[in-house]
Amino acid sequence: MVFFRSVSAFTRLRSRVQGQQSSLSNSVRWIQMQSSTDLDLKSQLQELIPEQQDRLKKLKSEHGKVQLGNITVDMVIGGMRGMTGLLWETSLLDPEEGIRFRGLSIPECQKVLPTAQSGAEPLPEGLLWLLLTGKVPSKEQVEALSKDLANRAAVPDYVYNAIDALPSTAHPMTQFASGVMALQVQSEFQKAYENGIHKSKFWEPTYEDCLNLIARVPVVAAYVYRRMYKNGDSIPSDKSLDYGANFSHMLGFDDEKVKELMRLYITIHSDHEGGNVSAHTGHLVGSALSDPYLSFAAALNGLAGPLHGLANQEVLLWIKSVVEECGEDISKEQLKEYVWKTLNSGKVIPGYGHGVLRNTDPRYVCQREFALKHLPDDPLFQLVSKLYEVVPPVLTELGKVKNPWPNVDAHSGVLLNHYGLTEARYYTVLFGVSRSLGICSQLIWDRALGLALERPKSVTMDWLEAHCKKASSA
């Protein structure tokens, strides 16, 4: 296994990523050919849904009994790792290459998705269009969607009142999830279901709920931030700004580089196929025909767990603990000793390893590229770079880690901290805003395809022991 031990190794990594960006894959060219000039996203879906329904029906009728793999005891007791059991259209995670959004890698998305006029990072609205339609949108389509979201972003006062009923010291994710639950009062799906809407039309009020939810979560999230850290001095939405820039503005950061970072952050955190806790939770709750607000609030509660979205908070806190104990100019040898000290105390190195990935997370790579471009001399970024060289060999030597490489959480906190968003407890809320794009996109397709109530079979240890005994004697 090759480790990144020097600056030249980092340079090779950058060259590899830039090489990926310089040439479009066949999938990118195909999607570009499929793009339409229609500016209305919903009408695009109305055209796509019947053919995808027929495709799923054919798949089920012709191949419904085809086996996808074997289930082992390890899978059952190990969190269903590696068990294929979900249909998730918007993205697919490859252990070696990382995430692909509708077939596109992150470098490809950076190449083909529209950007802000003065920016270089993909607009989240463009990714949302891609996730929902499988097509690369035009600049005009993204502008139309951006305006639609801006017009949907009004949040009722009772949502703020619900948040204000909580102590200002409550965790940001508690306040955020409570705000999303309060938004549920306006659910179009719930009203339509109570009025007897036909199941073939379920996707339409789901679409309205999801677009409204995506539009409003940045407003709620920004309110939580300003309430907790800026004396409750909230900043109103600016309809002239794109999704990422407006979120940055409402948080109180109007620097163009912060807006660019927010566009990148939302895009790369938006979706990571369907098996992770937040995505799976959203799908699971939605399969009961709970409306998108209920489903997404449940997903946020899963995201708040230390083993999922809370990890980005823990990374920055751990990095700062390194600085406090060893100083910013820590040598690689000292850093190696600190890493071993952390591991020997029974803790993990936050931001390293992944349940599926077996290489460096491409979401880490693109954040590193952003840092090299905009903040190469930042002390914490330089420490993150040293960790990239030190940690993988240590974890490999430890011998208990399938993936010793950094994931997305290993970098995001340092970027946010550099621009003044230093409140690490809040970082998971940013993750939650981003994840609304992927979870809501899939919820729309769940209802459009008529996917069933999720109901896997569970077993007891007695059953497993009896089954294994029978299998061994056969």
Swiss-Prot record:
Alphabetic keyword roster: Mitochondrion, Transferase, Transit peptide, Tricarboxylic acid cycle
Keyword Heme (UniProt): no
Documented EC number(s): 2.3.3.16
PANTHER family in alphabetical order: CITRATE SYNTHASE, CITRATE SYNTHASE 4, MITOCHONDRIAL
Record's subcellular location: Mitochondrion matrix
Span of the transit peptide along the chain: 1-16
GO CC terms in record: chloroplast; cytosol; mitochondrial matrix; mitochondrion; plant-type cell wall
MF annotations from Gene Ontology: ATP binding; citrate (Si)-synthase activity; zinc ion binding
Reactions catalysed, as given in the entry: oxaloacetate + acetyl-CoA + H2O = citrate + CoA + H(+)
Pfam family of the protein (one): Citrate_synt
The protein's name: Citrate synthase 4, mitochondrial
Family listed: Belongs to the citrate synthase family.
Principal EC category: transferase
General remark: Citrate synthase is found in nearly all cells capable of oxidative metabolism.
PROSITE patterns: CITRATE_SYNTHASE
